[in-house]
Amino acid sequence: GGKEGLYNEVIDYTIAGTQKLIGGAEDTLRAGLDAAAGDRDALARATAAFVRAVLTALLGLGPEHWPRRLIMREIDTPTAAFDRLYQAIFQPLIDAFKQVVVIATDRDPDNPETTILTNALLGECLIFHRNRPIILRDLGWHEYTPDRIALVVDIVVEGILDALDLPAVKGEGARAK
């Protein structure tokens, strides 16, 4: 019980909510990668759908979303709870995206360069969530709206596909209209 027990319950709640928010994207990605079976167009579509789902979910969380602030605090100043957050949220996200990097680039999954590239590309998604106040101010936006989220997502998807030398995915997103 006590303060530590309450914090652990809050961490459990945060993990469950985050898994619900982005966990489906990881499962869909894995299924898409299996179905792609070497087809780079299908790999690009699966990758784009994953990035689109994760980034749309993260940017849709307003600044008032307290679990977001809790996760950021744990990243900045890890406590014992960070290990639980890492294992339940970050490791599955990284593992799912690393599969994309390995398949798209034919890199060794155990090579540190593969892990660095994976985290760099995931960082392209997470930076818009993590640095929300900076980016909003830089763009002159008060907040992310659905149209603005769609624009950010389109640009990030395009950049990640390009970095992985995957073909562009046509006919999706805000700029396809």
Question: What is the predicted function of each stretch?
Answer:
Residues G2-Y7, A81:
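Short amphipathic alpha-helical segment with a characteristic S/N-K-E followed by hydrophobic residues
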Residues G62-R84, R132-D138:
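Amphipathic alpha-helical segments used for helix-helix packing
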Residues E64, F90-T115, D138, D162-G173:
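Hydrophobic alpha-helical bundle segments that form small-molecule/ligand-binding pockets
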